[in-house]
């Protein structure tokens, strides 16, 4: 491999990673602004005009601080897990059409599901490597919650594949040209949205970070740079899940607008959906753990299985009918 090829690959990778990281940084500012206005206060408004430079100031502050590691922790895993969390969070973006994917995979949805399952390891290892009971309990909660809700996410994706007829994410744009899939499969969309909240450990499903019980959950021993990496990974996953929701159910190719407007339309919809995540955080109290599991295993799982059977059987049933 020549030097020019390596350079071009590096530039391509950075050109898709840096905008995601910038968007994630400003999502934290949007969150603080929305929460502050909902609580009748101003929020960040000192650093830069209207507080716009606050995320940059926070990032600089965190990365120049000295990282502290507990003396009894596992040194290698303790440092590796935040890096792994951010690396996985950025890698999952590769097959998403924005409007063109970084890598056009035939099994894009399967890749997304497999990579999002791997994020469980970073949570579990961080809790175990910290050698703290609070961190370990938080990590075990996160693992149980994430694995549980991935079941419904996978079944909903399977139903969506039945509707679109392909695992490729680009096909969903063509499928949704006449009508958004949200109209034909709104129960799936509602369950998908709630499952993405649980998958990203956001309120009201933030059982892993219950301040009154576990101080800060799996990342309680992390400070400075490693904590910032976990923070970036969490918000990158939120944006990823919202982008995937838009791609699956509210694809930007509605009424075939010019391709130049695709990215703007997608970004606007993702921002609105991310704002609804923050609105829910400000509005709802935290679920009890048994309620969280009850919602999935006794409500969502039977419903999603029934919907999946419905979406599978309908094309087969209609295939035997004579043409009108």
Swiss-Prot record:
Q: Could you tell me what reaction this enzyme catalyses?
A: a ubiquinone + NADH + 5 H(+)(in) = a ubiquinol + NAD(+) + 4 H(+)(out)
Q: Per the UniProt record, which residue ranges are transmembrane?
A: 10-30, 76-96, 107-127, 143-163, 178-198, 229-249, 260-280, 300-320
Q: Name one GO biological process term.
A: aerobic respiration
What gene name does this entry carry?
A: MT-ND1
In alphabetical order, the GO MF annotations are: NADH dehydrogenase (ubiquinone) activity
Q: Pfam families given for it?
A: NADHdh
GO CC, alphabetical: mitochondrial inner membrane
Q: How does it sit in the membrane?
A: Multi-pass membrane protein
| Coarse class of the protein's main subcellular location | mitochondrion
What does the protein in this record do?
Core subunit of the mitochondrial membrane respiratory chain NADH dehydrogenase (Complex I) that is believed to belong to the minimal assembly required for catalysis. Complex I functions in the transfer of electrons from NADH to the respiratory chain. The immediate electron acceptor for the enzyme is believed to be ubiquinone.
Return the protein name. NADH-ubiquinone oxidoreductase chain 1
Give its E.C. classification number.
7.1.1.2
Asked if the keyword Membrane belongs to this entry, the reply reads: yes
Write the lineage as a comma-separated list: Eukaryota, Metazoa, Chordata, Craniata, Vertebrata
Sorted alphabetically, which keywords does the UniProt record give?
Electron transport, Membrane, Mitochondrion, Mitochondrion inner membrane, NAD, Respiratory chain, Translocase, Transmembrane, Transmembrane helix, Transport, Ubiquinone
Q: What family does the database annotate? A: Belongs to the complex I subunit 1 family.
Compartments, record wording: Mitochondrion inner membrane
